[in-house]
């Protein structure tokens, strides 16, 4: 009896020792951190398991309006609207590495985001400059700009050509950089291909004349998450288009090869009132967006799930609408988030598209986007 008791005790002890690392491994597989901007001047980090706010990083540069993770996932770049500032943070520690403002008492800038070069030295953006003179203000044309993050100043600008300035999208258009840092892409109703050495447009890719033959008014689908990298050379996004005969609006999935400069478009179905961004799972096989139909009291919002291998819509589910919101995803692709212009984050299961819970942030989240970090 004593032998059996000792044996059972040993088995229980061994089971406990095995269970601990398994539990830790299971927790580590799903544990992550969300980073998002809040009013008036902070970045919050949120535990993506409990929803608890872990850090509140104050930005002297003001209100964050865009967030971007470097391609190597080592740095975070935030831009602010209060002082036209740039903040660089360490992605692991969330500590501020660099922070400065471009505005002066007589000069103001306005830009919404941008993209760092592979070295992390320069930051490319599109901006407008406002000069305060003795008797008036002057406003520049839209300009391509290079910001030296070490010198903390704008080192090069080139005015945007009138034909490109007139394209829909404004200075909120998405920017991407080629892997070698030699080419900047600006996604409007055309893709502007810009040489980073001269800041001159060297090519204009008309999307309706690419592999989207038979369609007109092909344009990038909106949202701060509009462009997603499925691998270092390829972007995937939602695009909208219309047939050239009765002009019915449709949407589809588009892929853009940053190296070959090749665009492919696969139509999926009729367009809704609004399509908000695209979130792609880490394995690049599944993507999610939200679609809105109707207005005000008759508004209906749905999650749409896509298989990126077959390029088909595989599932959809209605969820509670908000007047304004942004779609986000956890770093493991298991959860979807509805957030922005509110004090909370709604959590949904990505597999079932069902509501799970709401996390209270205790602060008003901006529309700067959300980064899912390990």
Task: Enumerate the predicted regions with their spans.
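Short coil/turn segments that connect the beta-strands within blades of beta-propeller domains
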Residues: 31-33, 72-74, 119-121, 180-182, ...
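Blade-level signature of beta-propeller repeat domains, shared across WD40, Kelch, NHL, RCC1
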Residues: 339-374
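Residue position within the beta-strands of beta-propeller blades
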Residues: 36-37, 78, 125, 186, ...
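Short, conserved, GDST-rich strand-edge loop motifs in beta-rich repeat architectures
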Residues: 126-141, 234-248, 290-299
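Repeated scaffold domains used in trafficking and secretory/extracellular systems
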Residues: 62-69, 107-116, 165-176, 212-229, ...
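An edge-strand/N-cap motif at the start of beta-rich repeat modules
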Residues: 29-55
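A short beta-strand motif characteristic of beta-propeller blades
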Residues: 52-58, 95-104, 153-166, 200-205, ...
């Amino acid at each position: 009896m004593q032998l059996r008791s000792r044996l059972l005790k040993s088995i229980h002890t061994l089971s406990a020792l095995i269970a601990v690392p398994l539990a830790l491994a299971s927790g580590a597989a799903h544990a992550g951190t969300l980073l998002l901007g809040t009013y008036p001047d902070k970045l919050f980090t949120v535990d993506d398991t409990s929803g608890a706010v872990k850090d509140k990083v104050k930005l002297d540069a003001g209100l964050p309006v865009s967030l971007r993770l470097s391609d190597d996932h080592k740095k975070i770049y935030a831009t602010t609207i209060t002082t036209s500032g740039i903040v660089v943070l360490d992605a692991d520690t969330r500590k501020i590495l660099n922070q400065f403002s471009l505005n002066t008492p007589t000069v103001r800038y306005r830009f919404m985001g941008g993209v760092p070069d592979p070295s992390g030295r320069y930051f490319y953006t599109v901006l407008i400059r406002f000069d305060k003179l003795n008797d008036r203000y002057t406003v520049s044309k839209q300009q391509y700009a290079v910001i030296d993050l070490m010198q903390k100043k704008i080192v090069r600008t080139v005015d945007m050509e009138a034909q490109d300035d007139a394209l829909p999208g404004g200075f909120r258009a998405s920017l991407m950089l080629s892997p070698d840092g030699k080419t900047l892409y600006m996604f409007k109703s055309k893709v502007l291909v810009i040489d980073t050495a001269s800041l001159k447009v060297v090519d204009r890719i008309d999307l309706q004349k690419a592999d989207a033959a038979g369609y007109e008014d092909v344009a990038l689908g909106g949202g701060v998450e509009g462009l997603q990298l499925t691998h270092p050379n390829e972007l995937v996004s939602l695009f909208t288009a219309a047939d050239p005969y009765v002009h019915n609006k449709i949407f589809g999935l588009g892929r853009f090869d940053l190296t070959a400069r090749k665009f492919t478009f696969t139509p999926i179905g009729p367009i809704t009132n609004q399509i908000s961004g695209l979130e792609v799972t880490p394995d690049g096989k599944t993507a999610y967006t939200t679609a809105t139909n109707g207005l005000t009291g008759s508004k209906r919002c749905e999650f749409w799930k896509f298989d990126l291998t077959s390029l088909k819509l595989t599932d959809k589910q209605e969820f509670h609408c908000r007047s304004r919101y942004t779609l986000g995803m956890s770093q493991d692709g298991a959860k979807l988030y509805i957030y922005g212009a509110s004090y909370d984050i709604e959590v949904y299961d990505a597999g079932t598209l069902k509501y799970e819970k709401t996390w209270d942030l205790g602060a008003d989240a901006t529309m700067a986007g959300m980064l899912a970090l390990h």
